[in-house]
């Protein structure tokens, strides 16, 4: 009798029929019960269906051609035609491979298409980060920027390399499938170069050690990411993210690498026919960077295995005065357009830059050696006083920025609107 009573009190899963003693958890609903095992099974089914839907969605949406990718880059990045062409082809091939991944895996020819990660080499402010950002926006994929200088080997003070994937997961709203098709841009990659050519007895945790840690991540591995971010702790659950199909773009200025290239070129030059390069000639410097070889990067401090994971190399030229002026006025989100819109919000005030003022701004950026990155700070300094006073000044129609003919100082000139004539009151 007691056994029957116990059986009557025992609860069972409405789906698989297991009793509450056979499962870890039994959740009650309105007149039904479901066990933890059935919940896991349902989650797996939903996850698989979402994955199929995402793949179908990707295959239906048209992938822009290299020409279309390059045209979009032209709207935001001035110059750098060679780098844009290389990037357009590399990114197109990468996402074409992803869209046809199921066909490739099902193929009988056993040809495995490996991904081609990208290395961007160019001076500060030449457009490396902007190129990567524009590509991610065009392709509508998660994008994250990581600073190589903050990375250290696991177990040391600093950021673990897997934190990069954690940030990418956050950028994709914790959608693992979406994150696994994203783009990671690692900036300042030249700063993790090996400190010396000879192996050291002391561990190089922020140089060669980081390169070693990045190898598997860039090539493809199952990265374990804490669900809510933060540092890893024992006994906690992790989200597994496969980095095999994540596109890694690494960028760096590689200051001084031109000397390494020049030294190699001089060794191969024979007699009086060898080219003599003027170090102060910017055009020649750009030409030198275009001749970069893997051995130059090894000499600089990157390990051969790391260079091997970045087969596509694109060099960006140093921007000259004309290019900086173009950057100020031509791109879709040009700085002059941005500040003009900001001023128009102040009661429709028009902002105008005289031609000589643009030349002065470009020359100041060249003097600071910060490339296009320095343009915004120069504009902020120039417009600070007028932006401070403008909300308190009445009846302003236009602000003109012109350059002084004596000392190249930038001066804002305020133009007031004509006061409307008052109608005579009839009494």
Curated annotation (Swiss-Prot):
<dbReference type="GO" id="GO:0051082">
    <property type="term" value="F:unfolded protein binding"/>
</dbReference>
<dbReference type="InterPro" id="IPR027417">
    <property type="entry name" value="P-loop_NTPase"/>
</dbReference>
<keyword id="KW-0067">ATP-binding</keyword>
<dbReference type="Pfam" id="PF07724">
    <property type="entry name" value="AAA_2"/>
</dbReference>
<dbReference type="InterPro" id="IPR019489">
    <property type="entry name" value="Clp_ATPase_C"/>
</dbReference>
<dbReference type="GO" id="GO:0009376">
    <property type="term" value="C:HslUV protease complex"/>
</dbReference>
<dbReference type="GO" id="GO:0016887">
    <property type="term" value="F:ATP hydrolysis activity"/>
</dbReference>
<dbReference type="GO" id="GO:0046983">
    <property type="term" value="F:protein dimerization activity"/>
</dbReference>
<protein>
    <recommendedName>
        <fullName>ATP-dependent Clp protease ATP-binding subunit ClpX</fullName>
    </recommendedName>
</protein>
<dbReference type="InterPro" id="IPR010603">
    <property type="entry name" value="Znf_CppX_C4"/>
</dbReference>
<dbReference type="Pfam" id="PF10431">
    <property type="entry name" value="ClpB_D2-small"/>
</dbReference>
<keyword id="KW-0143">Chaperone</keyword>
<feature type="binding site">
    <location>
        <position position="35"/>
    </location>
    <ligand>
        <name>Zn(2+)</name>
    </ligand>
</feature>
<dbReference type="GO" id="GO:0008270">
    <property type="term" value="F:zinc ion binding"/>
</dbReference>
<keyword id="KW-0547">Nucleotide-binding</keyword>
<dbReference type="GO" id="GO:0140662">
    <property type="term" value="F:ATP-dependent protein folding chaperone"/>
</dbReference>
<feature type="binding site">
    <location>
        <position position="38"/>
    </location>
    <ligand>
        <name>Zn(2+)</name>
    </ligand>
</feature>
<keyword id="KW-0862">Zinc</keyword>
<dbReference type="InterPro" id="IPR003959">
    <property type="entry name" value="ATPase_AAA_core"/>
</dbReference>
<feature type="binding site">
    <location>
        <position position="13"/>
    </location>
    <ligand>
        <name>Zn(2+)</name>
    </ligand>
</feature>
<comment type="subunit">
    <text>Component of the ClpX-ClpP complex. Forms a hexameric ring that, in the presence of ATP, binds to fourteen ClpP subunits assembled into a disk-like structure with a central cavity, resembling the structure of eukaryotic proteasomes.</text>
</comment>
<keyword id="KW-0479">Metal-binding</keyword>
<dbReference type="InterPro" id="IPR038366">
    <property type="entry name" value="Znf_CppX_C4_sf"/>
</dbReference>
<dbReference type="InterPro" id="IPR050052">
    <property type="entry name" value="ATP-dep_Clp_protease_ClpX"/>
</dbReference>
<feature type="binding site">
    <location>
        <position position="16"/>
    </location>
    <ligand>
        <name>Zn(2+)</name>
    </ligand>
</feature>
<dbReference type="GO" id="GO:0005524">
    <property type="term" value="F:ATP binding"/>
</dbReference>
<dbReference type="InterPro" id="IPR004487">
    <property type="entry name" value="Clp_protease_ATP-bd_su_ClpX"/>
</dbReference>
<feature type="domain" description="ClpX-type ZB">
    <location>
        <begin position="1"/>
        <end position="54"/>
    </location>
</feature>
<dbReference type="InterPro" id="IPR046425">
    <property type="entry name" value="ClpX_bact"/>
</dbReference>
<feature type="binding site">
    <location>
        <begin position="123"/>
        <end position="130"/>
    </location>
    <ligand>
        <name>ATP</name>
    </ligand>
</feature>
<comment type="function">
    <text>ATP-dependent specificity component of the Clp protease. It directs the protease to specific substrates. Can perform chaperone functions in the absence of ClpP.</text>
</comment>
<dbReference type="Pfam" id="PF06689">
    <property type="entry name" value="zf-C4_ClpX"/>
</dbReference>
<comment type="similarity">
    <text>Belongs to the ClpX chaperone family.</text>
</comment>
<dbReference type="GO" id="GO:0051603">
    <property type="term" value="P:proteolysis involved in protein catabolic process"/>
</dbReference>
<dbReference type="InterPro" id="IPR003593">
    <property type="entry name" value="AAA+_ATPase"/>
</dbReference>
<dbReference type="GO" id="GO:0051301">
    <property type="term" value="P:cell division"/>
</dbReference>
